[in-house]
UniProtKB/Swiss-Prot annotation:
This is Ion-translocating oxidoreductase complex subunit D. InterPro entries: NqrB/RnfD, RnfD_bac. Belongs to the NqrB/RnfD family. Its EC number is 7.-.-.-.
Length: 351
């Protein structure tokens, strides 16, 4: 008979099952994104997942690690999925391949693999692509109700691999809405228009007519919110990070909007547009690169929320989730150091 030593804990959940649950929780948001922006989103996800699995398998083989066993943890699958849904649906195929390979090989495996990476791999891949190819990374189609030329599955496939539809239209022509005006994401559109128009006039534009967060985008964010609530219910993630993230972002947006409503976006636009809910529930909560203490998670999430608001308002990019997460990842060792819970019976030491 063997006697086990303490601590006596029991957890039936494996890394594989948690990763799979997170992947399943992404489905509502992916469905909404596919409905409003076409099949390109699904194609990007498929390309990213295939690249992630192949890149991870190749590195594991070179490191003489058990390839099939390690691939079964589903972490590469999740990294590819998160990066795939973050890219514009009709971005060239080589971009998603390059970004995913960089995320897996450099941002994850170079540090030792799962559990060793200090930065979120998917966001590292995204930022590398955004800095290297800013035009392609901001070339989103208009949402379905505003599309001048709806794009089917075959045209999406052709555009991703050749740059043109079967009728010869390129991405710039597909970006033109039904009103003949080239469309952008709500955050990008708001940021650009604010240079010459007041907020009230901007919110009268077609992309905002179905809601303050922009046509389609509020439904995508609601989809990821639903998936995030599922993760909280199943206790796959801690509540501290998403709650503090959203409260900090909403607080900054609300204060600025109340002080200068003609110059700042309303809180609803910040909360339900861009990658807000995806970032709050699926990216910032990465257990490897996030803070590990309860107070640390609150600080970590709030820091991301504040940084997202600062980048969106004062930065050069319309959405700042990826940069905010990576900047907060840098602060994790410091946050964890100063938020370690005090051991019962011991006083906090001073050095």
């Amino acid at each position: 008979m063997q006697i086990a030593s303490s601590p006596f804990t029991h957890n039936q959940r494996s890394t594989r099952s948690i990763m799979l649950l997170v992947i399943l929780a992404c489905i509502p948001g992916i469905i909404a994104q596919t409905y409003f922006f076409g099949y390109g989103s699904l194609i990007q996800v498929a390309l990213a997942i295939m690249t992630a699995v192949l890149a991870e398998g190749a590195v594991l083989h070179l490191r003489k690690q058990p390839v099939l066993t390690r691939l079964q943890d589903n972490s590469a699958l999740l990294t590819g999925l998160l990066l795939g849904i973050s890219l514009p649906p009709l971005a060239p195929w080589w971009m998603i391949v390059l970004g995913t390979a960089f995320a897996i090989i450099i941002a994850k495996q170079l540090y030792g693999g799962l559990g060793q990476n200090p930065f979120n791999p998917a966001m590292v891949g995204y930022v590398v692509l955004l800095i290297s190819f800013p035009v392609q990374m901001t070339s989103w189609l208009p949402p379905l109700p505003l599309q001048g030329t709806p794009v089917g599955f075959y045209d999406s496939l052709l555009t991703i691999f050749t740059g043109f539809t079967q009728n010869g239209a390129d991405i710039h022509q597909l970006q033109i809405g039904y009103d003949g005006i080239s469309q952008a994401t709500p955050l990008d559109n708001f940021k650009t228009s604010l240079r010459s128009q007041p907020v009230e006039q901007i919110l009268q534009q077609p992309i905002f007519t179905a809601g303050l967060a922009g046509i389609g985008w509020q439904w995508i964010n609601l989809g990821f919110l639903a998936g995030g609530l599922l993760l909280l219910w199943r206790k796959a993630i801690h509540w501290h990070i998403p709650v503090s993230f959203l409260l900090a972002l909403a607080g900054c947006a609300a204060i600025s909007w109340m002080i200068a409503p003609h110059s700042f976006a309303p809180p609803m636009l910040h909360l339900f547009s861009g990658a807000t809910m995806l970032g709050a529930f699926f990216i910032a909560t990465d257990p490897v690169s996030a803070s590990t203490t309860p107070r640390g998670r609150l600080i970590f999430g709030a820091l991301i929320g504040i940084l997202v608001w600062l980048i969106r308002v004062y930065g050069g990019y319309p959405d700042g989730v990826a940069f905010a997460v990576l900047l907060a990842n840098i602060c994790v060792p410091l946050i964890d150091h100063y938020t370690q819970p005090r051991v019962y019976g011991h006083q906090r030491g001073h050095k």
